[in-house]
Amino acid sequence: MIDNRDTESSKNNHGISWNTRRNHAAWKLYLRDVEEDIPVYAVPALQTDYSGLPPAYTFVGDREVFNCETLKYIENLKAAGVPAQVDVYPTGLHAFDMLMPFRKISKEAIKKFEEAYVYAVEHYHT
């Protein structure tokens, strides 16, 4: 959850594990009654300056509720000069790697995530 505003992939999404209805409910619970001056720590997509943030790796399914906001977040990091990478998996819904770990795309996503973690520990951890 990066953006509390609807994106193209989050509106009218009927995914089985996470969807528009669940997303709206989660944001409502999380933000409570805060509607103005929402801290960027609560909603990272509201950030305007991404410089100085740590490198990032993530993956997302192309049918994922968070697809658009994830891609935009990585794009913003890169534009600020932050090393960032995202892998997009076809047919992937929210949490596909955990719900269907036996699928080829899940195994690939898990493997690449583990590789990115090891790389981060070796190159960025002090």
Where are the predicted features?
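Alpha/beta-hydrolase superfamily serine-hydrolase fold, recognizing
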Residues: M1-T126
